[in-house]
Amino acid sequence: MLRTLRTSQLARSGFGTPSFGLRFNSVGRAFVFSQTGEPKDVIQVLEYPIEKPLENQVLLKSLGFTINPADINQLEGVYPSVPPKSVQINNEDAAIGGNEGLFQVLDPGAKSGLKKGDWVLPRKTCFGTWRSHALVEADTVVKIDNTDLTKVQATTVSVNPSTAYEMLKDLKEGDWFIQNGGNSGVGRAAIQIGHIRGLKSISVVRDRPDLEVLKKELTDLGATHVITEEEASDKLFSKQIKSWTGGKIKLALNCIGGKSATSIMRQLGAGGSIVTYGGMSKKPLTFPTGPFIFKDITAKGYWLTRWADKHPEEKAKTIENIFKFYREKKFVAPPVNISTLDFSKGNDVVLSEFLDALGKAQKGGGKKQLVQWVEY
């Protein structure tokens, strides 16, 4: 059942409500949840009134937001970080969904340090990007230089490219890495960032009818080799991998788990590391003992949220470096499926359209789901 709500009981730090354009209307909209469970059952659309910013606040409009696996996990209640419940609806605490998005300044407070028209990104995670407008403290966002940037590039920079950039930062020119999920958002970003930095890569993908098309697409992005999961797990094919790399793969990036993770771990050279940043298969990690003893392999996890919230200034530098790659035409944005929400339509229609995008995100398929509001 679709749920639409209206409220005037708002936390000033959480909501602001200008029109979507540069003029002011009466309401903004947000996708919120007050309990966890099946995403389509817990998401509600909230309509909220306009408030003017105080001197240290800023009024924002959304230029787009994404739906990432972490967002879905937060709705399901299986993610360690959760957005704050900063608004009351029907006497229940509710949180705004979304961690990644791009905003534009509509009305800057006198001491905000921002100006009308500026593009900004959330400084930390759990910002609540799934809303048309936001009234926030100015120090919770970071201004970006939007010169030669598209909205898609800026909207999608904070999660996948930043994750890839940080996981590869300790490798040196000429080093090898191997990754599963080579067609994923992080995988594509890692291929490109690695290529820019002079790294060599092997990307593992699932077999499919258009495999050769995908292989060409990824090698055009900069992948040194693209192989299938079956090849990665084949002990005979491991000899081919060793002939390419000299047995000196330093890093394995794992976003799948299960047998796929085991396969790429086996390809590591002495002193190599496998870093797990996701678990799409929902299968546990099972590694043989030998490589850990005789090849001094290490295994660890990487969680962008922890790093980004602990080091927001470093995160800002990482994002600016990725923007530099975009401006130099060295980096390509991930494939996206853009869903548009028409602000002139009723709440039931808007919620239905959002749930359709959410369903596509849950199914996966290689394209990031990006949502934009239609201006009017």
UniProtKB/Swiss-Prot annotation:
One of its GO terms (biological process) is fatty acid biosynthetic process. One of its GO terms (cellular component) is mitochondrion. The keyword Secreted does not apply. Its EC number is 1.3.1.104. It comes from the Eukaryota. Keywords: Fatty acid biosynthesis, Fatty acid metabolism, Lipid biosynthesis, Lipid metabolism, Mitochondrion, NADP, Oxidoreductase, Transit peptide. This is Enoyl-[acyl-carrier-protein] reductase, mitochondrial. It comes from Yarrowia lipolytica (strain CLIB 122 / E 150) (Yeast). The gene is ETR1.
